[in-house]
């Protein structure tokens, strides 16, 4: 929301997509919200406001009465987004990307801070939905509860309300409690933070990792298929991702984007749901690629030194492999801890990082053992 980027929640019915979307508006103080359940019969009047009969009569002007509709909302939730007709979808293109709405012969700058859409399915192919799909920068899959203890907790929680209504005690307390209201973001804070986010720098090593990810997306191995996929990510989407990275750094009191901010961007890169995990693996490998390359180079050099017995026991006369191994281990541990401390890295993502690093640490241990061969008679 602070980055101003759009979100789409994808998943089967009954996994609380609507509840999540509706509760996001409670983050803003005095925010106006608009929500609508799309259908094949939805009209632009229902989303953007009806045509003003008074304007037509008095000045022969075609304008919509937008008060209470999407053009005046801070937070918007559109359910079943792909069921909307072409007229609504085409208007949403400029609403989402430029936050502009053409009302008659006037162009309105919208107060829109966050637009959340939801659907049970991906957009159908061949129906001209690609441009609108590309506008949704963050793509989150909502899935049923996996852990048994969490499922039981949900069953026993009398406050859980999958409708998203604030009628449940837990939601009402959050929305109306005075203590929480002090934490809500005001319009002035939002504008100030937005300017500060623009000033956040991006480290050169972050750009290097992004380049590796971008190249890797040209040949993605999905579900061990024989043919690799070339996953297209538009320049506009990369620009929006950079904004998300700056927001991540700002929210964690940093003046520059670090590599630890990069892991969640896999949510912005997939086109088909089965690509998600493969792209997450690509991002994780890209994050640790500099350290992996150092390990490969060191192992190759060590193999040569063992083969030709070129290393001496004194550090001055040979390469300090022990020191390099310690340095690599420290680098792995440091980045793993940074990812673990990042506010936007989920527990599932942390588990994937740990699984990847287990093999990395094993390789370091084997390499450490190999160094002993340098001193064998």
Please annotate each region the language model reported.
Residues 35, 54-59, 75-88, 96-184, ...:
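Canonical AAA+ ATPase core
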Residues 18, 41-44, 63-67, 78, ...:
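Amphipathic alpha-helical transducer elements in NTP-driven molecular machines
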Residues 168, 173-277:
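Basic, amphipathic alpha-helical bundle interface domains used for macromolecular binding and assembly
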Residues 223-233, 239, 247-377:
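C-terminal engagement/docking regions of AAA+ P-loop ATPases
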Residues 9, 47, 79, 92, ...:
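Conserved RecA-like P-loop NTPase ATPase core
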Residues 1-4, 12, 68-71, 107-109:
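Phosphate-binding P-loop
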Residues 40-71:
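Short glycine-rich substrate-engagement loop in P-loop NTPases that contacts/grips substrate
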Residues 2-40:
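Walker A/P-loop
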């Amino acid at each position: 929301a602070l980055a101003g980027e759009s979100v789409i929640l994808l998943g089967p019915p009954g996994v609380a997509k609507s509840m999540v979307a509706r509760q996001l508006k409670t983050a803003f103080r005095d925010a106006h919200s608009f929500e609508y359940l799309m259908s094949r019969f939805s009209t632009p009047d229902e989303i953007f406001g009806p045509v003003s009969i008074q304007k037509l009569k008095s000045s022969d002007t075609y304008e919509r009465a937008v008060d209470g509709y999407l053009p005046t909302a801070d937070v918007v939730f559109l359910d079943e987004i792909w069921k909307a007709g072409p007229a609504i979808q085409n208007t949403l293109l400029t609403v989402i990307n430029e936050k502009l709405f053409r009302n008659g012969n006037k162009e309105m700058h919208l107060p829109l801070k966050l637009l959340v859409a939801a659907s049970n399915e991906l957009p159908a192919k061949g129906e001209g939905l690609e441009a609108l799909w590309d506008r949704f920068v963050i793509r989150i899959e909502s899935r049923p509860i996996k852990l048994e203890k969490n499922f039981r907790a949900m069953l026993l929680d009398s406050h859980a309300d999958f409708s998203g209504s604030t009628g449940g005690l837990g939601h009402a307390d959050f929305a109306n409690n005075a203590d929480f209201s002090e934490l809500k973001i005001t319009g002035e804070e939002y504008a100030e933070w937005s300017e500060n986010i623009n000033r956040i720098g991006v480290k050169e090593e972050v750009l290097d990792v992004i380049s590796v990810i971008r190249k890797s997306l040209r040949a993605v191995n999905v579900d061990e298929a024989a043919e690799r996929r070339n996953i297209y990510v538009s320049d506009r989407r990369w620009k929006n991702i950079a904004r998300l990275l700056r927001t991540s750094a700002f929210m964690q009191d940093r003046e520059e984007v670090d590599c630890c901010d990069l892991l969640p961007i896999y949510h912005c890169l997939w086109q088909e749901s089965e690509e998600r995990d493969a792209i997450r693996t690509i991002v994780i490998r890209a994050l640790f690629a500099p350290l992996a390359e150092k390990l490969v180079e060191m192992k190759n050099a060590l193999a040569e030194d063992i083969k030709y017995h070129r290393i001496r026991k004194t550090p001055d006369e040979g390469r300090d492999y022990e020191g390099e191994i310690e340095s690599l281990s420290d680098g792995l541990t440091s980045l793993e801890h940074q990812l673990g401390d990042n506010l936007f890295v989920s527990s599932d993502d942390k588990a994937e990082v740990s699984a990847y690093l287990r093999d990395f640490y094993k390789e370091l241990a084997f390499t450490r053992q190999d160094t002993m061969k340098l001193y064998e008679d």
